[in-house]
């Protein structure tokens, strides 16, 4: 700003040092030295240029000079007009022209100068030029050092940026400066832009150098990603790199695109490792047995899709038989997965676990097939895990107790008698069983019409058998009047023939089946029950024979059989006879008085043989 130094005349006539800030039509904006006065506009007639710095100082007595002095301590020093009165060595006695003639002062030679011969400035004393500054260069142009060479080239007194007008101001005392500014302005702005770019690169390089020096002593990892996987590693719009840079402790991530090398720098090993997990994409394969490929894929790819979703891999493909890019084992198909190392590890765990599960299931299936094959070879029924199976020897029905357990009075000799009696059964018994199995009554399972003899019915109901048991002396023919059809009470009352032997035979058959109870409700839809709520095989046999005799025998034979039937029923419920499917009824104390004799048993056997030829077997299954 020395080139734009001016002297401004004060109100006391002294000239004070100032600096031109702007040029106007008829005034100048002046800033005073040390800001002893505020910035203000000064008319041209109060401003003059300072004398040349190389002026010769030849002062003698009587010459007019200017003294650098001040009127008081509050004002700065200025140039005051004075006259030399006396000289003595380096000291001069001066007399101020603006003051009283009697006011003299002794000053040194350095404070004196010849009178300034410059006149006050005019409109054409200073020239101002403006250059519009682009937006990207405004910040750079605010620094006056950026215009140092330009100022020297155009011969300007001052160049500065005006933020309000966004223009570059060029002030000069020469008219030639205006022409040079018009010629060099574009070049100057272009050079500023180039300098800015170079300076920015230098600053970035400097920062990178400092950062590299710091990172050299920190944690870092370097790895290479395949070129075809580089897009996955970078992510959409660099999302993966941004995510890795956000990891706490990561200071820098560098990528060499030519070699596909990532370099990660961080404050700790964990931070660097975590950032690497976001960027390191690999391709790996897993061998799957050929016979399990379909099950690994699943219906509509459901299984493999679930594995992909849970593991986090990006994609999966199955290598075809005509592809030989990967090593292939016999009987194996490679599954190729692409993803981060963590996701590849996850998919290996999931797939290996699923394959192990499928192999175990296949092994269990083969064991089942071998068991079925062995069952077929030994002629047994094919294994079935459902339906009615064999009952064990300790099985007990929910409707009564096992007769062998509830009647401990039976001796081993009676068992032998039963086994011998069972051997007497002939073809007629097998035929009756065949007819029973071929026909069933439609009455419903285990229910009689009266409702007192079916499963779940009252134990003390008024059935035909219970009435006979309660009153053995009553008329047995009353049973016919109390029956509702030929398929109810008469069926139970017809047990007069072979009831004892048939019960023993049925017991013999059950003994072959581990002496288990037989639930009559599962064998017939219209089975009747005894007073204990259970059905015996003898019930079915006697019922079928009684029905056939009632339809085919004469009236006299029928009446005779009914008399004997009542007697046999009473004997059959005696304590000496073991119940087949449960304990005896509540009236067993009265019935236990009636004992069957060997003679009566023989008579019943003969009567059955006499009537068996005339009877038509009408059993039901």
UniProtKB/Swiss-Prot annotation:
Residues joined by cross-link Glycyl lysine isopeptide (Lys-Gly) (interchain with G-Cter in SUMO2): 56
KH domain mapped to chain residues: 222-251, 285-314
SUPFAM superfamilies: Eukaryotic type KH-domain (KH-domain type I)
Major localization class: cytoplasm
InterPro entries linked to this entry: Agenet-like_dom, FMR1, FMR1-like_C_core, FMRP_KH0, FXR1_C1, FXR_C3, KH_dom, KH_dom_type_1
Residues found modified as Asymmetric dimethylarginine: 447, 453, 455
Positions bearing Phosphothreonine: 401, 483, 611
Acidic residues biased stretches: 483-493
Similarity annotation: Belongs to the FMR1 family.
Name this protein carries in UniProt: RNA-binding protein FXR1
Native species: Bos taurus (Bovine)
